[in-house]
Amino acid sequence: MTIHLRSSAVRALIALIFVLALGALFNAEGAFFKWDTHRDMLRHISVFGILACGLTLVIITAGIDLSVGSLLGFTAVLFALLSLRLELSAWLAVPACLAAGALCGCVSGGLIAKFRIQPFIATLAMMVFARGMAKSISGGQKITTAILRPDGTYHYADVPGVFAFLNSKILGQNIAVVTLIFLLCILVCWIILSRLRWGRYIYAVGGNEEAARLSGVPVAATKILAYGLSGFFCAVAGLCQAAQELQGDPETGISYELTAIAIVVIGGTNLMGGRGGIGLTFIGAMTIGYLEKILSINAVGEAGRLMLTGAIIVGAVLFQKYRK
């Protein structure tokens, strides 16, 4: 396990260095060497990185979670509904959203562990269900405090303090709060995988489920835990997304799962399960973040970025299969 993680980390770091070299080479107007570029990249990739934290746990169990983007959208809308429309306290709204995300994840995990439904099918169903829930509770409309001015611009009135905090910057306006939340999620996952018994269970289930069961590992509970944590991290990302947009949009989060999966696999976590680590996911997030920033600086459109993301996922899977 340790040897695999070290070799995967080396390959992930090589990929990151290669992307940084591309940034230095294709450096439109010197933008890549400005701190604002790196700060904005960290802020942008943090939401995807939080999603990838939960996905890492799921993928190590040899599973997959296609619902992360929709769960982000659902919890973002729920947060806006509770905070902006119903004007509930953050002490009620935040735990409610986190619990809703974790519950949805546990439902997916239960379908997989107890009813033997394939992860792809179970999480695909949850993806559709969560998107429907987002549209249902919002009436298909954005939930916002935005007021349209006569000049065509928007004024955001009565923004709750929790929205302002999640959308703020600290340390002299250099680090976004969402970036610190991403780093905290990385730390939590590291503790789970490296210091807790459940972390060993997650690796055991992904490595050989039947052997883990015969060894006394609670396989079903481990899977439900992994998917429940994935749903929890989706909710964390949803809160951050709603705060950044100052609204709850039922369409937000579409295709986010692609970027989150790309982050995990480019870091080196094996899609077949049993191998990987949260440190690899952090490196993968930096790699994808810088790659997207380089493409943006050089005026590559969203279509090109999506195609590249798909190619990265396929390439990483083929590389893992070749090594195996």
State each model region's role.
Residues 1-44, 170:
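N-terminal, non-cleaved signal-anchor transmembrane helix
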Residues 1-22, 207, 214-221, 291-324:
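Cytosolic-side transmembrane-helix boundaries in multi-pass membrane proteins
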Residues 9-14, 41, 48-49, 70-74, ...:
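Hydrophobic alpha-helical transmembrane segments
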Residues 12-25, 55, 128-134, 179-191, ...:
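Hydrophobic core segments of alpha-helical transmembrane domains in multi-pass membrane transport
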Residues 20-26, 34-86, 110-117, 262-278, ...:
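Single transmembrane alpha-helix segments in multi-pass membrane proteins
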Residues 89-97, 103-108, 112, 170-247:
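Helix-loop-helix "hairpin" substructures at the membrane interface of multi-pass membrane proteins
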Residues 120-196, 222-225, 245-250, 300:
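Transmembrane helix-bundle core of multi-pass membrane transporters
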Residues 227-228, 233-234, 244-310:
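Transmembrane alpha-helical segments in multi-pass inner-membrane proteins
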